[in-house]
Structure formats: structure tokens, C-alpha cells
């Protein structure tokens, strides 16, 4: 470890404060109506790759309006009505905007209404919306169904306000083949026969949450589980593979206990499943649905015939990442995709921190160094972007899932924690969780909580520079000089760039931790 021969903490480069931008666009939908609760009924037809849906949305009209617009994609509406309004609305859809609009003959007054819709949807073969995965077993070919909604594909499953700031509660019931297991965000509340070899499974009302965190899974599944405090932790697999999830279950138990303590807010749901799915996707490996994490088998299960140390570490770290999201992302959610890093940077940092703490023998600190160096290489290019970047479209939101968001975000958090101290940082995170549980935030909400507890080491100005502007500071350290019993080191700052040698350097207030030797 390199230690500076200094006796104080310094900050390199006095630079003017960089203010956070004004609140970005946080919705592409009209602000006249907000959802309160979705009551969803789904009847999937897996062999035919289609499903029938019915949703009753309790909503609040905030100001007089003659229309209600929400998100919908690849859905066919059979009928719609607003309870208490005699005339049925006229329905129009906009495939490009991914919306459906319901127009009424007379203006709706402010108040609470229920919009009732019957519709049909498609089951895809790619991992968006409700999709199917086919796999082969000793008993032949099988098909299982899963959902993947982040960042904007819940609209393929339910007509909805499919944006993170529109939090609401959800009740789901599904009519499915009697021999199969249904998995959702909460444990099933009831099951009853539905005729023709079908059963209806109903799930209780969720806490308020964003649409992209809803989950539905159906298939020939096994499940193993264990209790951690008030929470049942489970691993769901295709039949015959449950024991391959034993390591992941033990990992989840240890991680959940650690997170309950670290965040200061116990996991609020009665169960936390990790659903292992066959196959893989070129776009993602796992998804943090609240109480129902989705992970491809290769990243979570351990086959004793081919298990390696790397696969064990991967299973643990993926578990740690997705479980961290249950707080950073699920309990507290960014208001819009500009602040995606609040989800991914923090989950990446918690993943590394927790893996290193619970398995120090793995020496995983090198992984953080590798991630940081990778992000720096990209951040030194002209094509880089700030950690917090303005997002206007769903396509731009999809492109924001990159190494700047993940690895640079993780590195900046590690730097700031090191600057203020681990205990102070944790206290700020706990205050943030308590204040903003079940709500949406922007990054400055976190900085305020850290500043409130760090006091003599405010971080907002430093954090703004590292999150609101792109690039990498380059710190040069001169040879130490000793005179009159004092040791001095001169530090100068520039900008590290690989393809813009003549670019005027940006400036950062860089926290420097200085220690003496001996």
C-alpha cells in the first residue's frame, strides 16, 4: 500500500462548485393521472405463446382531463371501461410512443376511479416482457415462463404507468396448469381449482413499487428454502436441480443477515426467492425483481460435476449484487433513468464489499481494481459520458447499463466511503434508507444524508464533479522533500485522456487520504 509521507488530509485542486442540474424529465406520460393499485389476472397459454389479461387499475385524476394515457406495447385491447362512467372510452394506441390512450366524452373530474381493461398479449422468445424458455430434460422437452421488465417492458404484460416514479401496489392472480408452480413477488395467498386441469393462484397485495420490479414465473419447478429472521429465503429451479442451488441458498442466508444489519432497515417482504432459469441472454445475467430475483442457471447453480472456485465466487457475487438491489433500487428507487447508477453502482459496490467481508480468503479486492481500471480506460475516451446522464427515451435508458454506470459508479462510492470513513458512510446510507423507503430519489438525496453525518467532510462538491462530468483526473506526485523537520509532497492535477491530447483539462476536487509511516 502506497502511503503519503504527510500528516493531514488534503483535497487536490480548488475548483468552482458544480451544481446538480435541474430536475430532469421524469415521465413521458401526461401528469394528469397517477396509478394507485393494479389488480391483475393472467391466463397464460404457453404452448401457443400467448396470454389473456385483465387488469383493474385504481387511479387518481389530479386535474380535469378527457383522456387517460398509459404505456402499452404488443397488447390487443378487447374492451375497457371506467367504473362509474356510462360511456365506454375510445381506445387508440401508438406503437412508436408505446402508449394507449382512453378518451372520454366528458371531462373527468379530479378524484379516484377504476379503469378496467381486458386484453391479450404475446409470450416472447426473447427475454423481454413475458417470455418462454425451452429446455430438455430426461423426460423430454419443457417450457417455462418468466418475466423481464427492466427497463421498460412491463408494458408488454400490463397496460401501466411503466416508469420508475409511478410506484403503486399490485395484486396478481394467475390461472395455470394444476401441476405447475407459479412464482411471484410474494408467497401465494390462495389456490383453488379452475376447471379443465387448471388452478387459480392468487397473490396478496404488494408494497408500493415500480412496475419494472414485478415478477411472474411458471413452470415445472422445485424450491428449497430456509428462514432468516422473518424472511423465508428460497432458490427455485427446474425439477431435479434444487440441490444445485444449495450453495446459493447458504450464500443468500449469510448475505441477507449482513444486509439487514448494514442498511439498518430489515428486508420488508416475507420471502426472497432467487429463480434459476435455463439458458442465457446476451443482454443480462440476473434481475432484481423485488422478492423474486431472476438469474440464469449458469450464474447461480453449482453442478458438482463441473463446479470450480470461479463458479462458486460468481454464484456468491451475483447473489450479493442482486440482493443489494432489494434496498438500493427496490425499496428506494431512482426517480428516472438519469440516476440509474444509484441502483447499479451501489449494487456493484455492495457486491464487492460483502463478498470480501464474508469470504476474505477469496481475495476479491482485485476484482474491484479490474473493474475500476476498465472503467477508467473507457472514461479516458472521447465517447465517454458522466455517471449521471440525461435520458429521454427508453432506448437511451437501455444504453445506460454500461461500465461507467456500474464500475465507475462503484469506484466513486469506494473513494467517497474511504474519504469520510466506513462508519460515517454507513450511517448516511442508513439515514437515506429510513427517510426514502418506498419512495423515489435523485442522487443529491443521498449526498445530503452523507453530508448530514460527515459534518467536517462534506462530499457533495466532490461527488458532483465525479458524477456530473466525464473523465478521469490525473494526479502527479513530485518527489518528497524534507526541510526543517517537515516532509512535503507537491501534487498537481490534469486529466487522463487517450484520444484528446489537446483537450483543455477538466478539474476535480480529489480527496487524498494522507498517513504517516512509523
Language-model regions, residue ranges each:
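Beta-strand-rich interaction surfaces with strong enrichment in secreted/lumenal proteins
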Residues: 40-43, 57, 89-91, 103-107, ...
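Solvent-exposed beta-hairpin/edge-strand motifs
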Residues: 65-89, 507-509, 513-517
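Extended, low-hydrophobicity, Ser/Thr/Pro/Gly-biased non-transmembrane segments
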Residues: 58, 118-221, 244-247, 466, ...
